[in-house]
Design a protein with these regions (language model features):
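Short, solvent-exposed mixed-charge patches
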Residues: 108-109
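The canonical Cys-X-X-Cys-His
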Residues: 12, 16-26, 85, 101, ...
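Axial heme c-ligation environment in periplasmic c-type cytochrome domains
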Residues: 35, 50-98
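Electrostatic cytochrome c docking/interface patches
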Residues: 1-15
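Extracytoplasmic/periplasmic, Sec-exported soluble proteins
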Residues: 4-8, 29, 60-61, 93
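Short cysteine/histidine-rich zinc-coordinating motifs and their immediately flanking basic loops
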Residues: 32-38
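Hydrophobic aliphatic residues
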Residues: 41-45, 73, 105
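Detector for the c-type heme attachment site
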Residues: 24-29, 42
Length: 109
């Protein structure tokens, strides 16, 4: 049977596929409108090689731990003010959705 964590990851993949995949790849080094999210959990914001980040994202000083990813997904304009994603994606509606997406992203390594 599936564990609660496996269910959360599966829910996160479904949310990612519907809300994030239009702009973000999950393949290393393959950027779209947004940067690849392969290996994003544990990485510094604005640090994926080969992607032209906004100054706001490059200079944010944020590490993408689960808690910060959820905050960003809940408030794409406010968590890192001035980032480009905030003008394109309003964010997820619940912290549960953000947590599920972060759980899925953590499997991409």
């Amino acid at each position: 049977s599936t564990t609660a964590e496996q269910r959360k990851v599966l829910a996160g993949k479904q949310l990612f596929d519907s809300a994030c995949m239009a702009c973000h790849s999950i393949k290393a080094g393959e950027h779209g409108i947004g940067p690849s999210l392969f290996g994003v959990i544990g990485r510094m914001a604005g640090s994926a090689p080969g992607y032209a980040y906004s100054d706001a994202m490059r200079n944010a000083g944020v590490t993408w731990i689960t808690e910060n990813m959820v905050k960003h997904l809940m408030d794409t304009r406010g968590f890192i003010p001035g980032n480009r994603m905030g003008s394109m994606f309003k964010g997820v509606s619940t912290s549960n959705d953000g947590d599920s997406i972060a759980a899925y992203l953590a499997t991409l390594k």
